[in-house]
């Protein structure tokens, strides 16, 4: 069984991730984990926090001499900004700082203090902050190394920011390559316009959202299942993506566009090559049919809402005085769609890893790879 948990607050001492179920014998590249962490921090439109933090991962358990041992892997990301928050985020003692009482529309603030019976919104916003995704990216970086050992790769690209759309015609998803630009967009002209839109929004004290795609390449046929709802791969991927802060919608393949066309134009026809292997000319399904991977690239698209912390605050309420006020301001980003695409890669990697381990086992990498090879040989053709 594969699972992971995260812990920690945005301005606490550290964030941690516990990853359980990675097979023994997987070689771990710490530099690659930290490269993924750096990708999450970059991006045009990010806030001042990124100039403070330089996220590095410490592996505290589960790895010895560069190889997993089969027991839980503990990952730690230290918050450098903690030294500026030791009084406000002290584990023990008496609060001396003014409480945060002006809720932000679109955030967890108001609902959280009601649900958990808190008087200070900071008790909610610290954990609900997207800073938590640093721990997810760390966990996802471990999962990616497992998937790469199985021949599976994951990439992403941004296709829309604030209504500025990239040209997505004729994309070769099977060979889509990683993009290291500061907006992770493969359309240079659109990216320049996205940058202008972000700059204008920042000057106006506003924020922007957008859309990105995560692509899983070289996925084996038949991972997932049609037999029970919770075994369906598309359910697991959609849930993983929707769990990311600020994500409001997810599509797989053509997604909601299926509503606009007849079935004859959308279902991916199958053909035989000369060697009797099956191929398709289209991939409207996005690599999943009947809750199972079908061998085509898996395409998951997600929409991120504009960040709800605005430098020109919206109208709101004060939970203590019961007066109408402007929402509180926290240091935040203008746009974090590029960062969300990296988090999306991590969450898809974690979900795919769970599905792969469910099918091929989790004791040791030798067994996993042998099981995968035997299975691929059986289903040829």
List each model region and its residues.
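Generic N-terminal targeting/processing segments that precede catalytic cores or assembly contacts
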Residues: 1-381
């Amino acid at each position: 069984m594969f699972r992971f948990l995260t812990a920690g607050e945005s301005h606490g001492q550290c964030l941690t991730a516990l990853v359980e179920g990675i097979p023994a014998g997987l070689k771990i590249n710490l530099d690659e984990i930290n490269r993924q962490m750096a990708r999450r921090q970059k991006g045009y439109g990010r806030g001042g926090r990124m100039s403070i933090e330089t996220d590095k991962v410490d592996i505290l358990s589960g790895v010895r001499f560069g190889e997993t041992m089969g027991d839980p892997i503990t990952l730690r990301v230290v918050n450098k900004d903690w030294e500026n928050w030791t009084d406000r985020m002290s584990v023990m003692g008496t609060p001396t700082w003014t409480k945060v009482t002006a809720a932000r529309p679109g955030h967890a603030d108001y609902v959280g203090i009601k649900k958990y019976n808190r008087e200070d919104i900071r008790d909610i916003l610290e954990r609900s902050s997207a800073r938590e995704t640093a721990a997810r990216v760390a966990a996802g970086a471990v999962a990616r190394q497992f998937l790469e050992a199985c021949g599976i790769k994951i990439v992403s690209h941004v296709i829309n920011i604030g209504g500025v759309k990239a040209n997505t015609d004729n994309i070769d998803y099977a060979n889509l390559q990683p993009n290291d630009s500061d907006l992770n967009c493969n359309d240079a002209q659109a990216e320049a316009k996205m940058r202008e839109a972000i700059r204008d929004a920042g000057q106006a004290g506003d924020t922007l959202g957008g859309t990105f795609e995560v692509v899983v390449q070289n996925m084996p046929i038949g991972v997932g299942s049609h037999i029970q709802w919770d075994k369906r791969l598309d359910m697991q991927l959609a849930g993983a993506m929707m769990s990311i802060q600020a994500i409001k919608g997810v599509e797989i393949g053509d997604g909601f566009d299926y509503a606009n066309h007849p079935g004859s134009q959308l279902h991916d026809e199958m053909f035989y090559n000369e060697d009797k292997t099956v191929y398709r000319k289209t991939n409207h399904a996005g690599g999943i049919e009947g809750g199972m991977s079908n061998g085509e690239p898996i395409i998951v698209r997600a929409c991120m809402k504009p960040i709800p912390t605005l430098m020109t605050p919206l109208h709101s309420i004060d939970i203590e005085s019961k007066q109408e006020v402007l929402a509180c301001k926290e240091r935040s980003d203008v746009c974090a769609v590029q960062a969300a695409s990296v988090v999306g890669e991590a969450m898809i990697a974690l979900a795919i890893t769970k599905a792969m381990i469910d099918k091929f086992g989790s004791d040791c990498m030798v067994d996993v790879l042998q099981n995968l090879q035997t299975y691929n040989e059986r289903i040829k053709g």
